[in-house]
Amino acid sequence: MKKGRISGKLRYKGMPVILGVFLLMAAALFAERSGIRYILHQDQAVYLDKEKVIRADEAEARLKKTCLVVMDSRDLASCQIYEQFQQILKDMKVGYEMRDMAETRELGELDAYETAVILMSDLNPLKEEVLDLAQWVKAGGSAMFAMTLQSDTYVSLMQQKLGIMSAGNDYLEVDNFHPSEEFMIGGGRDYTITDPFKSAWNITLSERAKLYAWSSGKYKIPLVWENDYGSGKFVVVNLGIYVKAVRGIFSAAYSLLSDCTIYPVINGSAFYLDDFPSPVPGGNGEYIYRDYGINVRDFYANIWWPDILALAEKYGVRYTGVVIENYGDQTDGVIEHQMETSRFQYFGNMLLRHGGEIGYHGYNHQPLALGNVKYGDILPYNTWADTEAMENAMTELLQFCREMYPEASMSVYVPPSNVLSEEGRQLLAAKCPEIRTIASNYFTGEFAYEQEFEVAEDGIVEQPRIISSAVIDDYMQLCAFSELNMHFVNTHFMHSDDLLDEDRGAALGWETLKENLDRYMGWLYTSAPLLRNLTGSELSGAIQR
């Protein structure tokens, strides 16, 4: 009996230990399923007060006009490149005056300027004014010919002054751009030009000219060079491409006009995860099953998300994820609150815990657009019944995010599919004061809300995303390289459901797409080791400044 009593006491004493083990296991399971509660890393004062922000237009109006821009509105190409230079010079904080040779035949008093940018390929409208320009450069001025020049009488008068030893009457195809390492960030390698055409003048440079960029291949085609002339210099761009995707090349070329060129840049890199957190994405999971033999839900939890976090750890990336509450297509303003929240808690809290940020994407994936927007067969979306319906949807999204992440500061809105109508934009400014940033698209596209890096009149920061997906094709690489040199910025987004869509690389498989992302991030941070990793709101704070 005595022995039995001792045994019973021992069993009783062991119960608290066993209970403690079970409680620890339960706590660990809860933490795992909820993503572990986040610790806020974000500085709550990343934004400037709206009244303290000096907008780009205001700053431009105050600039001393030190640059003369010469163009010809009768020439479509001249108009195209002038459109780009308007933004380039604004962002570089260079004050300028424009002369349109369709309206005048005189350059005016050149001594009033420090630099001149000639946006003309045909110099005949300038006539003898080109000789006055040459004399001004010889006396210490700096002039840039930004367009591929035509072989004509007045150009021939300038050839030697521009550092051209000989020139043909033909043009050569430019299928890549190779900047020297000292000329541009990310230099020392080829950047493929998609859809190349004969855009460069077939010329040979003199030994005096200093070459900064060329097209490598069978022939080394000079694309950017400078040539000293007297006390001044000429800079020539022989690229023949005048689109937004190559602004960084022109800004770098403009910087050659002075011995030291300084202008404010953003200095920031932001990676976005669109549709994240969200319900389990719909779509075709055949490539996931092909490669891993598991369903979509398990793939995202056990493979995709750990890999995304591993890349963040490797490169110091702090993702900004933007929430989709549901994938329904209802647009009548009747709201159904999301009841299944475990994925939002798990992935969202994990994202925050790793120094990331949560933003807004949509109550559903229907862009904020009314019936006056006609998608046709281009986009598979519905339009909203009225403004009240859109407002109901946004109110629900904001409330849902507050419930999911009550301690997080959320201010960034990403339009579904980068589509945002004028009415939707007005709604955000008028009814959603929480939203301080709209992050959409840098380039034009079907129904795309195209942006510049700027602060809008209503104080909302416009923050375009430059490239997307994990495919990272040649065009995206060129765009990323260009903007790294224009604004010292990177903005990239991908969707959590890219692996369910062949158009976004699903057939390549996640291993290949992951390698592409790894390679891109490696290039980015090797090329620009001083580039700051920021969240979406932090990048907006940098844009404000």
State the predicted function of each range.
Residues 2-22:
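N-terminal Sec-pathway targeting helices
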Residues 63-67, 142, 198-268:
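A glycine-centered loop/beta-turn motif at secondary-structure junctions
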Residues 74-152, 302:
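Helical hinge/lid and interdomain linker segments adjacent to catalytic or ligand-binding clefts
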Residues 20-26, 386-457:
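Catalytic domains of cell-wall/extracellular-matrix polysaccharide-remodeling enzymes
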Residues 252-270, 307-320, 403-405, 432-453, ...:
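C-terminal domain-boundary segment and adjacent tail
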Residues 242-252, 256-350, 354:
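Active-site beta->alpha N-cap acidic-glycine motif
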Residues 124-190:
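A glycine-rich, often tryptophan-bearing local segment used as a flexible ligand/cofactor-contacting loop or short
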